[in-house]
Amino acid sequence: MLEDYTKVKTLVEKDGFPSGTIGIVVSLYENGPACEVELWDSDSNPIDVVTYTFDEIEVVL
């Protein structure tokens, strides 16, 4: 189950970011299976926030 601050990996290319990009969930949508993900660069610095549906991301353990 996803919740705020869950670490995730993207499964699709979106808004110029490749699949496999790592980030954290910063906001869950109440109206559907989607969330805002803060994407990180290779040094774990935040670079952007992008909306993903739950089937476009997976939890990183």
Say what each PLM segment does:
Residues L2-L61:
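Basic/aromatic-rich interaction segments and small domains that mediate binding to polyanionic partners
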